[in-house]
């Protein structure tokens, strides 16, 4: 028989801080240079034209424009930003027609 009560240790009692990953700006939304488009773990989304990628795989805009998502392959996606000049020209063409 034990002289002292055995002290157990809890395997719970820890919780990690939230990382707030995910898409921050969706397709068709206007972004300015430096805006974060999405935060991710690894490269599910790859940077396209006018888009940069940080050391933690954060994808951000390099120019002012509109966000555009596209399929790179069956599993991978590509994120582009269409600059403002091109967006304005397309709007003017629609208004004239």
UniProtKB/Swiss-Prot annotation:
Gene Ontology biological process terms from the UniProt entry: translation
GO molecular function, one term: structural constituent of ribosome
Highest taxon listed in the record's lineage: Bacteria
Renumbered residue ranges of the record's region Disordered: 1-21
Keywords tagged on the record: Ribonucleoprotein, Ribosomal protein
Ranges that cross the membrane: none
GO CC annotations on file: cytosolic large ribosomal subunit
The keyword Oxidoreductase is annotated on this UniProt entry: no
Cystines in this chain: none
Signal peptide, first to last residue: none
Family annotation (PANTHER family): LARGE RIBOSOMAL SUBUNIT PROTEIN BL27M, RIBOSOMAL PROTEIN L27
Stated family: Belongs to the bacterial ribosomal protein bL27 family.
The protein's name: Large ribosomal subunit protein bL27
Species this chain originates from: Gemmatimonas aurantiaca (strain DSM 14586 / JCM 11422 / NBRC 100505 / T-27)
């Amino acid at each position: 028989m034990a002289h002292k009560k055995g002290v157990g240790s809890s395997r719970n009692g820890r919780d990690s801080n939230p990382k707030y990953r995910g898409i921050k700006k969706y397709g068709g939304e206007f972004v300015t240079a430096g805006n974060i488009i999405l935060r991710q773990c690894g490269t599910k989304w790859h940077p396209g034209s006018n888009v940069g990628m940080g050391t933690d795989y954060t994808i951000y805009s390099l120019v002012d424009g509109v966000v555009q998502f596209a399929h790179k392959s069956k599993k991978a996606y590509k994120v582009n930003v269409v600059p403002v000049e091109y967006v304005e020209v397309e709007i003017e063409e629609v208004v004239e027609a």
